[in-house]
Amino acid sequence: MKNTKALLEFWEEQMKQSHRSSNYFFRKSPSHYHMMLLVMSAHKFDQKLSVEELKTKLFKTSRPKSALIINEACEKGFFFLERTSTDQRKKNIKPSESFVKEFDDYIITLKNLVL
């Protein structure tokens, strides 16, 4: 029960943070959270993830909606786009250094709250 209370307190603290923070942005919808996990998974496993691949992998999200979320995440500085060397039309999506740190801190805190 103690860990459940700690998890609740952690969640409430996350939600109190600025509306411009990544904590708020990626919890707006399941699609936002799923996108964060897909991008960070590719980053952690040192895999390339193109914008088109990301749009395809997001379930129950239209391509225009996916594009809006990606653009907003880039505008807020959580992700950035990098053109590939082989095909200048293709762009890979990567997390910013500051977002990687926020994500790592988030994961460490969650691990410490094991129920």
Show where each model-derived region lies.
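Phosphate-/nucleic-acid-contacting segments
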Residues: 52, 59-63, 88-91
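Short alpha-helical segments that sit at the start of domains
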Residues: 9-38
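Short helix-to-turn junction characteristic of helix-turn-helix DNA-binding domains
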Residues: 39-43
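A short, conserved structural fragment
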Residues: 74-84
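Short, cationic-aromatic polyanion-contact patches
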Residues: 84-107
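Amphipathic alpha-helical dimerization/coiled-coil segments
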Residues: 18, 104-115
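Short acidic, hydrophobic short linear motifs in intrinsically disordered regions
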Residues: 45-57
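Short amphipathic alpha-helical interaction segments
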Residues: 60-75
